[in-house]
Amino acid sequence: MATDPRTMLVTCALPYANGSIHLGHMLEHIQADIWVRYQRMRGHQVHFVCADDAHGTPIMLKAQQLGITPEEMIAAVSKEHQADFAGFNISFDNYHSTHSDENRELAELIYGRLQAGGKIKSRTISQLFDPEKSMFLPDRFVKGTCPKCKSPEQYGDNCDSCGATYSPTELIDPKSAVSGATPVMKDSEHFFFDLPQFEKWLAEWVRGSGAIQEEMANKMQEWFESGLQQWDITRDAPYFGFEIPGAPGKYFYVWLDAPIGYMASFKNLCNKRRDIDFDSYWKADSEAELYHFIGKDIAYFHCLFWPSMLEGAGFRKPTKVNVHGYVTVNGAKMSKSKGTFIKASTYLNHLDPECLRYYYAAKLNSRIDDLDLNLDDFVARVNADVVNKLVNLASRNAGFIAKRFDGKLAATCAEPELYAEFANSRTAIAEAYESREFSRAIREIMALADKANRYVDDKAPWVIAKQEGADAELQAVCSVGINLFRVLMAYLKPVMPLLAERAEAFLAETLSWDGIEMPLVDHTVAPFKALFSRIEPAKIEAMIDASKEDLAKEQAPKASGPLVDDPISETISYDDFAKIDLRVALIKKAEAVPEADKLLKLQLDIGGETRQVFAGIKSAYNPEDLEGKLTVMVANLAPRKMRFGMSEGMVLAAGPGGKDLWILEPQEGAKPGMRVK
């Protein structure tokens, strides 16, 4: 156990709740989980939390496309995300959502403190506005021609072709990505977080706290030199998020409440556990440690805005912001068409999660380098290291111990110096884990595995087994081999927890960091069972093919048309239909109902009888255009008393509503009063 136990809160960046987890996401979550599991092995108290980032325009619009509420969509996505993380053995203590009571309360608290401290400013700004959808357009929801290189179909904040950044208003021929309409400029009052007030404090914190990697600190210096700007934290309705207190129709920008989601998830955990004090972790003078694991694409928010918000609101700042690079596959950006944009669930359907955990660990360091998942190297390395070196070390010794000695290890360690060398390596491996130099830790472990296998090769227990009177030597050699395997598995336990569990079952012992100081002697192990399977190249091919199928499903034409929006009702009997008396009617007179937004009053001739009907078609027809037309009405509908008069039937019309309504018009030759069958 650690001599000085530490108290830590560890977070991963919050996945956005409008899509699936993929292997790019998994890099960060595996990296953080390995570090957390190592710290727990050392006896430290660690709380590991995450949540879904569940607010914003993209979620609102996608939910509309799916025909469900945003709440329904984010609930379904959260369930999927949590299943994926569980599948990769990510050991979260809590997984929550930014769309929660805890996050609302904390966002309002932090905003209130910033506002009271003079850190919130307001001013009127002009933004692009979609006149058809009646909504302001975020940068990524405007497309047009790049003002610099003239490439078409570029987003409103930067050009994918030339890399230029610009304002949406600078786009040439901008179009709304929501409706296709040409946006107009419209004024709106917005609230801003006054980041420049924190510039001096930020510069000192970046260089003096040790919280930021050197590469990131150098990048932040560039941001300081270009000048910090006030940060717009407002979005206008319609928007899915939290309304700003005292500002109806104004909402917190998703990036304001997203990092507060770390606090909210931890608060939710505290409410569940009752033995954890929230304030002791988040008060300004907290002695607990706070670690964020994030990707380099969101470093700007986590290294500038987030610590400044915490400082302005009187909360503690991160101990360390650990930034990592992107994942590439086979040396290139993940590609859906090539099948290398691999969802976590697709991977889990084909391969062992421990394989990816090991491969990522073997390539991860503390820098912001991109990591390439080379699938050929992935197969070769996992099979060579985990199967051939590690698992084989156990299997080639366990058989002799089981068959010849009933699973009993020797009473003493025959190679105390060799064992001590392995056990003493934990200092260097611990330093590598602590500093997130996982690739260095794996190199150290695999170098030991090579040495252990050389020992077995040199001793050749399969030869000793054939020699008469050599049982003691055979037991001694194989016991050393199994003990060296035990040390290696203890070192790999943070990386491959499931393999470690299976190894523990074989060893009949829980693997611990300090427990490996002494070897297992006079100890009975369980019968050996296969611990791990080789990766077959065919499984890689199947996974890639399945990823292409995922793309095909995404690209399949979405069903559209009236039946999608308004499905056919339940089946009725012929007798039910026969009860409805439909008649041709002549519209003799039509007039607007001044007190009603949607109604026209119609006088209908149905062949010797006149009926008065109020019809909700005012949005689609001028009264004078209807007079003299034939239509169809339900003639035997019970009269309905309305405040404008009695309605004596119903006119039939097709369409979703608004301007899109069309009354039924019988062809020439039909006469008022004729039954429609």
Swiss-Prot record:
Is required not only for elongation of protein synthesis but also for the initiation of all mRNA translation through initiator tRNA(fMet) aminoacylation. A motif ('HIGH' region) lies at residues 15-25. GO terms for biological process: methionyl-tRNA aminoacylation. Keywords: Aminoacyl-tRNA synthetase, ATP-binding, Cytoplasm, Ligase, Metal-binding, Nucleotide-binding, Protein biosynthesis, RNA-binding, tRNA-binding, Zinc. One of its GO terms (cellular component) is cytosol. Residues 576-677 form the tRNA-binding domain. One of its GO terms (molecular function) is methionine-tRNA ligase activity. A motif ('KMSKS' region) lies at residues 333-337. It is found in: Cytoplasm. It catalyses: tRNA(Met) + L-methionine + ATP = L-methionyl-tRNA(Met) + AMP + diphosphate. InterPro entries: aa-tRNA-synth_I_CS, Anticodon_Met, Met-tRNA-synth_bsu_C, Met-tRNA_ligase_1, Met-tRNA_synth, Methionyl/Leucyl_tRNA_Synth, MetRS_core, MetRS_Zn. PROSITE patterns: AA_TRNA_LIGASE_I, TRBD. Zn(2+) binds at residues 146, 149, 159, 162. It is an enzyme of class 6 (ligase). Belongs to the class-I aminoacyl-tRNA synthetase family. MetG type 1 subfamily. This is Methionine--tRNA ligase. It comes from Aeromonas hydrophila subsp. hydrophila (strain ATCC 7966 / DSM 30187 / BCRC 13018 / CCUG 14551 / JCM 1027 / KCTC 2358 / NCIMB 9240 / NCTC 8049). Binds 1 zinc ion per subunit.
